[in-house]
């Protein structure tokens, strides 16, 4: 996460080395590691475990929040963030790992072990995110761990440190039956990585970056070869699709080792492309390089309100969305991202810090959360009603409301309101609908849960006095229309005519 800014089911295979796509296999010298055999033990076989489409949550904050007394509830019943995410369909937990942080006891290897066990106890997969730093890394900061500072200018020795650290971490986790299914080699590595000072992030030294990436990738490969495991590898950037494509091309030209997935951070606050454009890039990336696209971090606001004095990072709505946030639109964005990635052969989608609510937790920037308006919980730590967590579910229906506004006059435009537009306080909001060509028909699509019902009506302008008068024979709830999402279909159209 950029913390400095105030920061059909596609199966995953192991790395695809397509014809015409070179995969460097010896770009880093391999130190001798005596506790790993050079070949598989006699009688063992390489596992070829395939992962399902990933629907994940980065829950790196959970242990700290619980230590601060945070308790999550659903309909008044206390549940952990792990239990809640899993119950709605999340199948993976992403966890950040810092090398040796001195300012916090969290995101250390000891802390991560606790989190991995929690995930595995629920049958969830794990992605371990190596930051290769003692603190946050992102496009604006990427400082080498203090323990490696003396060799920061010797790329060969620094690469050996990366290799040995990555390998020894995996060995330790294997010995405790806590092995991750996926490993991320660096976090939001747009610029130079593992530098002495953040003033050295640019110009980007791709050759140095590739050597360091290869050290981590080679460590995972050697671990897999020696143990028969098949941990998948991820490289991660926070870029738009065009820049990300160029980034991969640069690495390929310099002999990057094979890796399974390209992770993207995708936030409306910093990336303005659409889920549709994300889907196009997902397809292009695999067709060109044989690399799966993983949205390693994403999230969307459900309110612009704050619940503490810690500056919130996000306030923008996704491109093309109404300007008024609500839990339903948070869900809509995440569902669109999921479907765009899955329908184009991508690896999956991970929501970042959906549990990071306001508390007494301490960050480098203050006390509290920079993310409570992006979390899946309200300001009382109650799970949002029809909010972002429902994107994990496969029981969503794309409901399209169509209204013919010809009876409303030539200057009228289409707007909609209803229970699904309710803001953080339960107040309905007015959303603009999109005109279909030059016709009098206006349309709005949202992703409701199967069987979900509620009241709604149309307006001819963006003010409450412009509402339609729904005839008594069309009233389904109060004096309004009634929608009911299908219980069996994935798509549904509700067509109406404006009523005077």
What are these regions (language model features)?
Residues 108-111, 138-252, 257, 272-280, ...:
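Active-site cleft segment of glycoside hydrolase catalytic domains centered on the general acid/base Glu
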Residues 59-62, 98-100, 131-135, 185-190, ...:
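Active-site beta-loop-alpha junctions enriched in small/polar residues
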Residues 403-451, 461-484:
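Aromatic-rich carbohydrate-binding modules that target alpha-glucans
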Residues 81-82, 222, 226-232, 243-318, ...:
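Glycoside hydrolase catalytic-domain groove-lining segments
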Residues 3, 16-46:
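Bacterial Sec-dependent N-terminal signal peptides
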Residues 55-59, 93-95, 126-130, 181-185, ...:
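Hydrophobic faces of well-ordered beta-strands that scaffold small-molecule active sites
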Residues 305-336, 340, 344, 352-398:
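Aromatic-rich peripheral "rim/lid" segments of glycoside hydrolase catalytic domains that contact
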Residues 46-114, 118-125, 131-162, 168, ...:
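N-terminal substrate-binding region of glycoside hydrolase catalytic domains
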